[in-house]
Amino acid sequence: VARTLRGAVTGGLLPEGTRLPGHRRLAGALGVSRNTLVDALAGLEAEGYLRVQGRSGTVVCVPAAEAAGPLTAAQDLPLSAWASRALSGGVDDAGGEYAVDFRVGQPVPELYPEAAWTAALARQAGRLGRRTEEGKFSDPLGPLETRRALSAYLNAARGARVTPEMVMLTGGTQSALDALARVFLEPGRVAAVEDPTYPGARAALAATGAAVVPVAVDAGGLQPTHLPPQATLLYLTPGCQYPTGVTLGAARRAELVAWARRGNAFILEDDYAADLHHTGRPLPVMQGLAPDRVILLGSFSKSLAPATRSGFLVAPPPVLRVLARTRPLTDRAPGTLDALALADVLDSGAYGRHLRRARQVLAHRQEVLLAALSEGLPGWAVQGAASGLHVYVRLPAGLEEAQAVAAAARRGVALSPVAPLSATGGPAAVLLAFAHLPPEAIRHGVRRLASS
């Protein structure tokens, strides 16, 4: 009875000020005893939905919380300055259904090494109850054996200079960026990013209140001469610049290290998609050139699967000591089971075998895309095609980016525009992700684009 009457009040069927019928009449209408009705009305009166006005009877009233209405938007919340800045960053995905979806950020389920990962999880789950003190479940840096496995892998495969004491496991690159931004940035400080760049990095840095300065990228990567001298952090994707795909050469890498040392700054090197490099051998990481000034960030979400949420950062010991002290304020420690499974697939060689297969698949799909673009859209210029899961395509003169994206959508094809990734504007360009699409879907999508 109380639920029915309460719903009638909150739903507007019984507006404020409505006088209820007498108890006997209302009980009859509701099909309940008078005693049951009296108990229900007493409860609603205590909740503030009803008010007894002496001989005038019982009147409906709306509690203040109900009268104010529900919170419907972020502006209704007492947000902090950090949250307000965070909400203003990033890029919204327009969503929608398409015949062929070339947008970036798509999972590639057929490349997921399900059997190897499941077996590793099962083995490590069986060991959890037998862990020794060496495992240190509560270590904010993560299990030591995983940090050992990662160190060995990064030194051998990426030319890094890492010891286990320099590694912290993370939930991915974004969580590492957030942790570092909170430690190093605040209002009045300056960070620098490539332009264009990964919007999640720009948003994480800007959320601290620091000024984020975009630095132009050309065919050789970020241009060191444009760097602000007072920056505390520089976010960089030197091995495969996101989104252009260009590689930062050795001379510019040396210039950036010298800049960081002069200004007591740190370079945040995002080793984006390096494991999926499928043309030649990628350059070693910058961290190997300057372990004292480069903080290496990495994630296995692209090369394994997003659901694993396995990432890492490699930092100089003084930085890592600060991170170890501050991490418990947010999530205390990384997930142990996923961390141990990662060590398992690295040490067993399963990850290396998986990468060899994945690179072959990606190389073939990219070849199909490049051939289809060359034949069907010869005016679309591809650059930075050596690595990654997408290609960056410069549009022909006279074709605006928004115009190309809209025309493609009318033909049932989704593209990722580049404009939202840049703070300063730039040439009209789009991104075409290929990793998640079988070859025939790629060809079909380009045919549709050519007819748009």
Features from the language model and the residues they span:
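N-terminal basic, amphipathic alpha-helical segments
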Residues: V1-R123, A324, P328-G335, A343-L346, ...
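Short beta-strand "wing" residues that participate in macromolecule-binding interfaces
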Residues: R51-Q53, V162, L415
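Active-site PLP attachment segment
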Residues: R55, G288-V322, P334-L337
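Conserved core of the PLP fold type I
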Residues: L121-Q124, L128-G263, D275-L289, R293-I295, ...
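Helix-loop "lid/cap" segments that line or gate small-molecule binding pockets
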Residues: L150, F312, L340-S348
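Hydrophobic residues in well-ordered beta-strands that form the structural core
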Residues: V193, P214, E269, L342, ...
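Short helix-loop capping/hinge motifs at secondary-structure junctions, enriched
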Residues: P317-V322, Y351-G352, G398
